Amino acid sequence: MRPSGRNNDQLRNLKVTHNFTKHAEGSVLIEFGDTKVICTASVVAGVPKFKKDSGEGWLTAEYGMLPRSTHTRMDREAARGKQSGRTQEIQRLIGRALRASVDLTAIGENTIKVDCDVIQADGGTRTASITGASLAIADAIEYMKQNGILDEQANPLLSQVAAISVGIYNNEPVLDLDYDEDSNAETDMNVVMNSNGGIIEIQGTAEGKDFSEEEFAKMLGLAKKGIKEIFATVF
């Protein structure tokens, strides 16, 4: 039995609020159960130096957690003077996943800057960030079309992207782990897929106990099922 009482293949309650903030070109509040993340996509003219005069745009992502998004308060990383390795790893994951969904040549020499800010954490913050950011990017691209930054016929989105966590909890594969499950899981895996059914990234780690190829296949099957439900629900 899962602590939440959910079935092994059951997602948490999923809710998306578009235009959650008024300044960003795209903004979404995404909620997976008690995990809540604000995802914004900001459009900035110009590109980094390594993209200058390439005719291509760029997309980058930042990730952070509010000090009391967790059970006990943690210091802001800005106050500590540097980002943790975990934060840097998650930012890179989010950026890779989202760049796989956008035709950078189609946005011209513009940059889309994604910010994912966790306001409440209960497991699955990185996967929620990817899903919410994909929705925010779609809204930002629509803004670019409506405001003459892009031609109305432009279609920079190659696909949408969603992500979910799966794992082995009490010797059983489960979908969409909350904090209680994640902190006690024998295996934790994050899966990122696009709306065409393609796999973008898989991160899987055994926590003190290995997992079999059969268990891996079961977890991947759960992830595919969950992501399909996410696309059907919020995209």
Swiss-Prot record:
Matching InterPro entries: ExoRNase_PH_dom1, ExoRNase_PH_dom2, ExoRNase_PH_dom2_sf, PNPase/RNase_PH_dom_sf, Ribosomal_Su5_D2-typ_SF, RNase_PH, RNase_PH_bac-type, RNase_PH_CS
Gene: rph
HAMAP family registered for this protein in UniProt: RNase_PH (MF_00564)
SUPFAM superfamilies per UniProt: Ribonuclease PH domain 2-like (SSF55666), Ribosomal protein S5 domain 2-like (SSF54211)
Signal peptide segment: none
CDD domains: RNase_PH_bact
Protein name: Ribonuclease PH
Enzyme class: transferase
Residues binding phosphate, per UniProt: R86, G124, T125, R126
Pfam families in the record: RNase_PH (PF01138), RNase_PH_C (PF03725)
The species this protein was found in: Francisella tularensis subsp. holarctica (strain LVS)
Enzyme Commission (EC) number: 2.7.7.56
Origin: domain of life: Bacteria
Keyword Nucleotidyltransferase: yes
NCBIfam families xrefs: RNasePH (TIGR01966)
Gene3D superfamilies in the record: GHMP Kinase, N-terminal domain
One Gene Ontology MF term: tRNA binding
UniProt KW keywords: Nucleotidyltransferase, RNA-binding, rRNA processing, Transferase, tRNA processing, tRNA-binding
Entry function: Phosphorolytic 3'-5' exoribonuclease that plays an important role in tRNA 3'-end maturation. Removes nucleotide residues following the 3'-CCA terminus of tRNAs; can also add nucleotides to the ends of RNA molecules by using nucleoside diphosphates as substrates, but this may not be physiologically important. Probably plays a role in initiation of 16S rRNA degradation (leading to ribosome degradation) during starvation.
Assembly with partners or alone: Homohexameric ring arranged as a trimer of dimers.
Reactions performed catalytically: tRNA(n+1) + phosphate = tRNA(n) + a ribonucleoside 5'-diphosphate
UniProt keyword Transferase, yes or no: yes
GO terms (BP aspect): rRNA catabolic process; rRNA processing; tRNA processing
Family according to the record: Belongs to the RNase PH family.
